[in-house]
């Protein structure tokens, strides 16, 4: 199987690459990575044909979504599929109010549940 091979996604008119890039690591899960490393990870995935990116507000308290947007902003939007999650809203927070675990040096947000 090739990472760039496209497969139909469910019963909708959408195709995604066989391999996707799960972005929890760029949200600094378990250990911190710098911006250069994050950018390089996105570029490496792109260079290998990956066009499916999965992120979530909870990954690094918003850091993963920021880095995903930063790295993909110059790519043609019709060339990739971006998935995220619902149910958690990010709100600005003071650093001392945040329980980072298991994230390292995460974004400055707290999470609230909202399934409306």
What would you call each of these model-derived segments?
Residues 93-98:
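Short aromatic-enriched loop/helix-cap "lid" or pocket-rim segments at secondary-structure transitions
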Residues 1-92:
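N-terminal binding-site loop/beta-alpha segment at the start of enzyme catalytic domains
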